[in-house]
């Protein structure tokens, strides 16, 4: 069977953009111009404070559902490791810990994802699309009823999405535009049930151990969490034929 591969470090290599830049195209939209008017200076100051150039920007996102926090890590494309540059509180997310396995279950997904698009016309001001379902979801979820359209967006209402507020989505959207404009091909996003310290992971297994599907996923996420905490480099992740992952 085919093994699906997502190699986040490889996709973070430096590359150039054409003169018709991604930023210029995005600035054709009113809400993106509003986001830049209110957040560009903040973004520039934050990156400069961490010695990261917007012209060489690479970002990586981690979400912790229980804590309702999104971390944004950044580096220059020539750097080897990421630095934590911003924590965004999540205003609302529906569901409980555990993976999303079918449509209309109101669950926020968990696992290894990437950003698959930016929407400047969102019903929720601005939105950032998550590539749910990923290869694992397609194998382990309810076939033909997986659901889709999972976004990080404005407002403070969630039906399986990550609602950030309009103010926070403006800033996050600008970071994403800048990363794409600097040549990043894929922005990695890992969604955890919680910050997976040894104690928290043990508690999850104790409280939810009967949910074998979630336990398998959490084991893979725990390995990813520990590796990143140690190296500050997103691990390489292979999606295996049974829907589990090889994390290195």
Regions found by a protein language model. Give the residues of each.
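Cell wall/extracellular polymer interaction/catalysis modules
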Residues: 17-159, 167-187, 196-248
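Hydrophobic transmembrane alpha-helices
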Residues: 191-193
């Amino acid at each position: 069977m085919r093994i699906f591969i997502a190699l986040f470090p490889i996709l973070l290599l430096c590359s150039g953009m054409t003169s018709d830049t991604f930023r210029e195209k995005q600035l054709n939209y009113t809400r993106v111009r509003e986001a830049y008017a209110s957040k560009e200076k903040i973004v520039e100051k934050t990156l400069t404070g961490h010695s990261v150039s917007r012209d060489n920007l690479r970002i990586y996102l981690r979400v912790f559902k229980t804590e309702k926090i999104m971390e944004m890590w950044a580096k220059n494309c020539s750097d080897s490791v990421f630095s934590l540059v911003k924590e965004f509180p999540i205003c609302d997310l529906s569901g409980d810990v555990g993976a999303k396995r079918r449509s209309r279950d109101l669950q926020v997904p968990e696992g290894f994802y990437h950003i698959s698009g930016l929407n400047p016309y969102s019903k929720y001001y601005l939105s950032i699309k998550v590539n749910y379902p990923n290869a694992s979801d397609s194998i382990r979820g309810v076939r033909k009823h997986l659901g889709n359209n999972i976004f990080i967006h404005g407002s403070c209402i969630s039906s399986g999405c990550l609602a950030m507020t309009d103010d926070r989505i403006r800033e996050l959207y600008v970071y994403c535009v800048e990363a794409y404009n600097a040549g990043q091909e894929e922005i990695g996003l890992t969604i955890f049930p919680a910050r997976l310290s040894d104690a928290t992971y043990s508690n999850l297994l104790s409280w939810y151990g009967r949910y074998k599907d979630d336990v398998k996923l959490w084991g893979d996420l725990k390995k990813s969490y520990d590796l990143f905490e140690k190296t500050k480099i997103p691990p390489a992740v292979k999606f295996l034929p049974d829907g589990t992952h090889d994390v290195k």
